[in-house]
């Protein structure tokens, strides 16, 4: 799946070192809910355990063929899936790459997988992510108080949803 300079492709074993580096980067993991630090051996086990599963899609975001982040869909079931994204390379942030990659993933979700809706959770303090999600057409549906634990503290999260029809009207011609 490709737009002008942005491409998303399936996550491969040789992407493990980038994922580990990106997730362990303090500039990226403030709002991530991982058991940190990630290590390559455990991530390799994760990769082999999840390879070939049809209830998830893990991908790499490339900009001009350079891997710059991860994106995907989890819990693909009954016409729904949970979206995630981390742009790992700081020098590529703020350039619209995350939006382009998100649009590509959502096109795949709605056109190829025939999903009805894609949802996500984001912490209330993660303002840059909320701006991205709203630019892509996600709608903030509710506040879930104390719904996750991040670094030993309960955190509030927003629940966002985008339906196939909402995506089509927001992203015409993209």
Each model region followed by its residue ranges:
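Structural motif
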Residues: 26-27, 54, 113, 136
């Amino acid at each position: 799946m490709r737009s002008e300079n942005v491409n998303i492709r399936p996550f491969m074993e040789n992407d493990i070192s980038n994922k580990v580096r990106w997730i362990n980067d303090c500039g990226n993991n403030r709002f991530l809910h991982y058991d940190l630090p990630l290590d390559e051996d455990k991530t390799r086990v994760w990769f082999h355990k999840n390879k070939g599963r049809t209830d998830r899609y893990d991908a790499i975001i490339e900009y001009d063929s350079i891997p710059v982040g991860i994106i995907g869909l989890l819990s693909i079931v009954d016409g729904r899936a949970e979206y995630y994204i981390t742009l790992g390379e700081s020098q590529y942030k703020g350039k619209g790459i995350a939006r382009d990659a998100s649009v590509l993933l959502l096109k795949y979700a709605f056109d190829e997988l025939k999903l009805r809706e894609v949802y996500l959770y984001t912490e209330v303090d993660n303002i840059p992510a909320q701006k991205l999600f709203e630019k892509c057409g996600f709608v903030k549906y509710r506040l879930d108080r104390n719904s996750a634990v991040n670094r030993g503290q309960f955190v509030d999260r927003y629940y966002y949803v985008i339906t196939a029809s909402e995506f089509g009207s927001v992203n015409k011609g993209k």
